[in-house]
Swiss-Prot record:
Reaction equation(s) it catalyzes: a phosphatidylglycerol + a membrane-derived-oligosaccharide D-glucose = a 1,2-diacyl-sn-glycerol + a membrane-derived-oligosaccharide 6-(glycerophospho)-D-glucose
Signal peptide, first to last residue: none
Keywords assigned by UniProt, alphabetized: Cell inner membrane, Cell membrane, Membrane, Transferase, Transmembrane, Transmembrane helix
PANTHER family referenced in this protein's UniProt entry, alphabetically: LIPOTEICHOIC ACID SYNTHASE, PHOSPHOGLYCEROL TRANSFERASE I
GO cellular component, one term: plasma membrane
The protein's role, per its UniProt record: Transfers a phosphoglycerol residue from phosphatidylglycerol to the membrane-bound nascent glucan backbones.
Biological process annotations from GO: glucan biosynthetic process
Primary location group: membrane
Protein name, UniProt field: Phosphoglycerol transferase I
EC number: 2.7.8.20
Organism: Escherichia coli (strain ATCC 8739 / DSM 1576 / NBRC 3972 / NCIMB 8545 / WDCM 00012 / Crooks)
Subcellular location: Cell inner membrane
Pfam families: DUF7024, Sulfatase
Length: 763
């Protein structure tokens, strides 16, 4: 209803101003600004829905403010471009419509009415309401009854007898198991669900609606609310350090805790969370690549579900035979939005819906088959009688290709339990939420029936039953939950440990690189993860007087304030204000200590603008002074006009990437010398090794041969035509995720370049 009202007010404002208000620059600007805000808010809502399927909420802040945690990023580039182009077109059209009768005399009454209607359209819009609620949730003091409902369980289980297998199905919500809505979509896993304890009404609450948040909620009994934005949990050294979570209790009770997934463990801070709470054995894409049968069989996120669950089964066998009490947690990935992935071993590779193939449904049908096969192996084993199997979704599905069909149903998270010691077959329709999962498991294992805000659904009463407005209540508790982090509110001294790549201050530790916004009563860490904007772009969003501490590789800040360090890959610390003074310090000791030094200076807006403009220069446009092209830093030498076919800088150099261009092309500002030596320090990838690699300058071509290790080769060129472009053509670029950013499409690698130098020859 509010959507229709807000749009009606918007349309009325446009029509009244365009046909009745007449000409007045101030009223035109004011009305266009407010109407433009309406457009921006609704496009933001649309974009947020596109990424997460949940509007503008904490998941958007966590996932989109500084990272794209739930996205295979390459698949969102075109929609992103479309949104920008659409926004530009709408603004242009809006301005043109409002100025239709600009030659008519100004009418104050109609202008005021149009502006009031525009303001009303903004106030009535769902986007404005959601953002307002988010802002309020950030500034509340908390709810006095939090302490009455937040309960810490005993740190041990008195007499543990059962092993635990806990399977998180990525986005595998219970809605998919509705056979009337989606016939024969989940037959194998659905049959297993019907054999166990099936909890049919597990709702999703704020702060539990993305992977790491769902894991925290299910293991600690609290939503993931933090004193920082974005993906900062990937940079902290501990995760809710004061809380008792399921993993802590299991470890204290003699369990060895294992976690296996196909994606990188560092993503979204899962490794930090698990290590902070009792898990000593973690396996992700990096750990598995040396043990899986086919390390090249991967999707955009990591290893396919069939590979991961095979490794989980091997681990289950090994641990069961050892006689050691254990828990084995695993997380699938093939059902990740927007489309999902199909494991090659599946029989169910295709699912049609609405008369056409649907990739997301196909991925669900395939993944549930793999999960069911894993469970059936456990059930057929002699160790099943000592095992509890839990299957749950980490969160509801985000905006995938099945999302519009899911939204037509009553959506709930998946949570069911199969007990080997005491088979029980029952569907329990009790109202509950993800925070109750850990408490229910703890109860089954013989521990307490409460965990944080979670309650056992077998012997306790869920917060979802106690509070009819549980979503609002959860947001009211947000400040109380944030305080559980015990996060410092000031930063005066800090220490950098180069061996660990960590910064420490006020008792907290963070991974480097890191940007910090420091105010009187708050320290806000802004990390650089796989999907966050580079720290310099985040710094460019700071206000002129915001105090900052920026710890990064020297070359990244050198172009602004320390040109002598433009080629240094050491750590440097910059601090100050963008509109005031800044200092850059070179970290020259293994353990380096310093203090914050923010001077209260007069703000220079010209300096601020210059700093912001420089910070926003994209990597390929950065230029530095050097006599060679150094590939492990961003940019290129001043002599280079432009380049293409080259991937991002890494610690050693850069790969050629045929996704960006079939050949490496470096165009110089001026013609290359008549006679010169080309000194290339590089290596080859895969089948490009020991193959002739053409290197061209103008009409002359030389051959380069590289191995898999870095070597230096000198080629001799004559350049009678004054050519200004160097071209290198890898013979067989290889599609691979080697060294790739999690969630990105594979790169096509050919040669790895460390340094290229042009040396003029005499004569």
């Amino acid at each position: 209803m509010s959507e229709l009202l807000s749009f009606a007010l918007f349309l009325a404002s446009v029509l009244i101003y365009a046909w009745k208000a007449g000409r007045n620059t101030w009223w035109f600007a004011a009305t266009l600004t407010v109407l433009g805000l309406f457009v921006v808010l609704n496009i933001t809502l649309f974009a947020s829905d596109y990424f997460t399927g949940a509007g503008i909420n904490d998941a958007v802040l966590y996932t989109l403010t500084n990272s794209l945690t739930g996205a295979g990023v390459s698949k969102y580039i075109l929609p992103g471009i479309g949104i920008v182009l659409g926004l530009t077109a709408v603004f242009g059209a809006l301005g043109w419509i409002l100025r239709r009768r600009r030659h008519h005399p100004h009418h104050f009454g109609y202008s005021l009415l149009a502006l009031l209607l525009a303001l009303g359209s903004v106030d009535a819009s769902p986007a404005f309401r959601q953002i307002t609620e988010l802002v309020k949730s950030q500034s509340r003091d908390g709810d006095p009854d939090f302490a009455a409902y937040y309960k810490e369980p005993s740190k041990t289980i008195p007499d543990p007898k059962l092993n635990l297998v806990y399977i998180y199905g990525e986005s595998l919500e219970r809605t998919y198991f509705d056979n009337e809505a989606f016939p024969d979509l989940t037959p194998e896993l659905g049959a297993l669900k019907n054999e166990g304890l099936d909890f049919s009404h597990t709702q999703q609450l704020p702060g539990t609606d993305y992977t790491i948040a769902g894991m925290v909620a299910s293991q600690c009994g609290i939503p993931l609310f933090a004193p920082f934005e974005g993906n900062a949990s990937a940079s902290v050294s501990s995760f809710f350090p004061q809380n008792i979570c399921l993993g802590d209790i299991l470890k204290n009770s003699g369990y060895q805790n294992y976690f296996v997934q196909g994606a990188n463990l560092r993503f979204a801070g899962k490794d930090v969370f698990l290590k902070s709470h009792g898990f000593d054995h973690l396996y992700g894409s990096e750990e598995l690549k040396s043990v899986v049968a086919d390390p090249h069989y991967r999707n955009d996120w990591g290893f396919y579900d069939d590979t991961v669950l095979d490794e989980a089964w091997k681990k289950f066998e090994e641990l069961s035979r050892s006689g050691q009490r254990f828990s084995l947690f695993t997380l699938t990935v093939d059902t990740h939005h927007p489309d999902g992935f199909i494991s090659r071993t599946c029989n169910r590779k295709k699912y049609d819906f609405d008369g056409k193939p649907n990739q997301s449904f196909s991925a669900v049908s395939c993944s549930q088959e793999n999960i069911a096969a894993f469970i059936n192996k456990i059930k057929a084993s002699p160790w099943f009688k000592d095992t509890v199997i839990v299957v749950s979704s980490d969160h509801l599905a985000m905006n995938n290709t099945a999302w519009k069909y899911l939204n037509k149903q009553d959506r709930n998270n998946l949570f069911f339990v199969i007990r080997g010691d005491k088979p029980q077959q029952e569907t329990l329709a009790v109202k509950r939420n993800t925070m109750d999962n850990g408490a229910t498991v703890l109860d089954i294992l013989g521990g307490d029936n409460y965990l944080g805000l979670g309650r056992s659904s077998l012997s306790g009463q869920s917060m979802s039953e106690i509070f009819l407005n549980i979503k609002e209540k959860t947001l009211a508790w947000k400040p109380d939950i944030i305080r559980l982090w015990k996060f410092p509110k000031e930063m005066k001294e800090f220490t950098i440990d180069q061996q660990k790549n960590m910064i420490a201050f006020s008792g907290s530790h963070f991974r480097l690189p890191l940007l910090l916004r420091v105010s009187d009563k708050r320290v806000e860490p802004l990390p650089e993860s796989e999907y966050s904007a580079p720290l310099r772009f985040q710094l460019a969003d700071f206000a002129p007087r915001d105090n900052f501490v920026w710890v990064d590789r020297c070359y990244k800040m050198a172009q602004l304030w320390a040109p002598e360090l433009a080629l240094s890959t050491d750590w440097c610390v910059s601090q100050g204000q963008l509109g005031g003074q800044q200092i850059v310090q070179h970290v020259d000791k293994t353990t380096w200590k310093s203090k914050t030094a923010f001077k209260d200076t007069v703000i220079d807006m010209a300096r601020y603008k210059g700093n912001v403009d420089t910070l926003k220069i994209v990597d390929n446009d950065i230029r530095y002074k050097a006599d060679s092209f150094i590939f492990n830093v961003a940019g290129a030498p001043e002599e280079v006009k432009q380049f293409s076919g080259i991937s991002r800088p890494e610690s050693w150099g850069r790969w050629s990437n045929a996704q960006l261009g079939d050949e490496v092309k470096i165009e110089y500002k001026h013609p290359l010398p008549k006679k010169f030596d080309l000194v290339i320090t590089a290596k080859a990838y895969g089948n490009n090794a020991s193959r002739p690699i053409p290197v061209r300058v103008g009409n002359e071509e030389q051959t380069l041969v590289l191995g898999n290790e870095v070597t230096t080769t000198t080629l001799h060129f004559d350049n009678p035509t004054d050519a200004d472009t160097l071209v290198i053509v890898p013979p067989e670029p290889v599609s691979t995720n080697e060294g790739n950013i999690l969630g990105h499409s594979p790169r096509k690698l050919g040669i790895g370049m460390v340094d290229i130098k042009v040396v003029e020859r005499e004569g």
